[in-house]
């Protein structure tokens, strides 16, 4: 938009001072059902794969989420670390960074999103407004999630969360101590309050 007039331009023809008109993304319904969508979403955020076995750790309050997990093979409880290790049946998990797109039903995509948000999401509050952040060292993975959100009619943004470098992190051995670990560069995907409201109208919880 320039001077009150609407002009159609290609991206490479945009100039400083041009303003983009607001638009609504369409909501696309797919037909394929993702039977273990929540579990795969959680696995994408906090899952591990070792010697042919996929599993996740549930610490503290997150152990309440065990009832939402599907295709569980066995659960190992470590009371010293207040942790459950949940192992899944072979062949029931997609690749760790798989993201369901518009060929899957809206319900399947929302359940997958709930899974990764429960494992790797952070809610930020500013007064009455809430926003949701998903962090990852895998930029392409976050871009795939951003694309999935667009198929649900929702916009989001991606920015840098932190640079790579050495940081103090928990040793994860039950001691409560920390140690120096080299961390990769991290990114975060941000979903603002308006977009969260749209997702809630679709059934996201």
What are these regions (language model features)?
Residues 1-205:
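Internal intein/HINT superfamily modules and their associated LAGLIDADG
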